[in-house]
Amino acid sequence: MRRKGFRRLPGFPASIGIAHPRHTASTDSRQTMIFYFSGTGNSLVVARELAKRLNEPLVEMASSHTAPPYVSPDAQAGVVGFVFPVYAWGMPHVVEDFLKHYFRLFMPKTQTHAPAASPSQSARQNALPSAAETHKPTAARSQTLSHGKPYVFLALTCGDDTGKTPVSFKNTLKERYGLHVDAFWSIQMPNTYISIPGFDVDKESVAKKKIGDAALKTAHIARQIQKRQTGVFDVKVGKFPNIKSHILRPLFNAFLSSPKRFHADVSVCTGCKRCVKSCPLANISLQKHTNAPATPQWGANCTMCLACYHSCPHHAISWGAFTKGKGQYRMKGIEQGD
């Protein structure tokens, strides 16, 4: 099998990637936090930089349901941010699950749910700003937060475009929690999805440029958040977003997201456990063999982040026949288990 070399490209500047606790209680009366999910490190490095610049704690969505909430019932709302990658032009399954079942644990008890939207309201909710298609940021304005209302932002990482992901996220927060999203951004990062024909990791020159541009944009985003700018929609939605998110995405979920297709080549695998440590959902275990190294086994709780594939130092992991001969990528400075 032809294998491309394992590459760790230079990450963000040295100021980025400072370690932050996954769950850190804030002593400020205005509760602030950034919820994030990351597979290969693209979203994590963005979330860490925003947390450092904004002095906010990070909360990992993949494991936050196991940690006690730390939002006091009478706390004033501050900044609530979300950083995660776009998977198949939508939210990763783990993010959808968090928003539906666990985000409420972090909300003040006085937070009420929004009433169900009328048909006309639903139509407006599914509309995107006309600037979205051309990737031109809409005008932003400064706003002083009212008591109890958080400033909510979404920063998406993606290899190219987002499809209707911002709309799906916006509607979920509005319908379940009555929260309004004040600002949206998308940040292009090196491509990691390689599980279908024609998809591979970016060339090194392309990946380096994306990382450099992403570092600059992340700093700009932090400044906009510090000013509490609202009405921001700086997102590359891409062409045919409805087709991608509403037709292609269900097909991806039905036929291209099963962990049953993962396989480890026993002639190459050394049982080093890097795949186990890299899985954000603890979905991989090692199965012992007689007279052979233990090999990974995948459970059913998979969000198709491909961290296991990209983290294997021996390129022993494949997903069906679609990943044969393709490259690997993981953000430099992100350790196994981060």
What label would you give each PLM region?
Residues 27-34, 40-45, 53-64, 77-84, ...:
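FMN-binding flavodoxin-like domain, especially the glycine-rich phosphate-binding loop
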Residues 73-75:
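A short, aliphatic-rich alpha-helical micro-motif
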Residues 239-277:
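A mid-sequence, solvent-exposed acidic-amphipathic segment
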Residues 264, 274-297, 303, 307-325:
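Iron-sulfur cluster-binding cysteine motifs and their immediate structural context
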Residues 329-337:
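Active-site-proximal loop/hinge segments that shape catalytic or ion-binding/gating pockets
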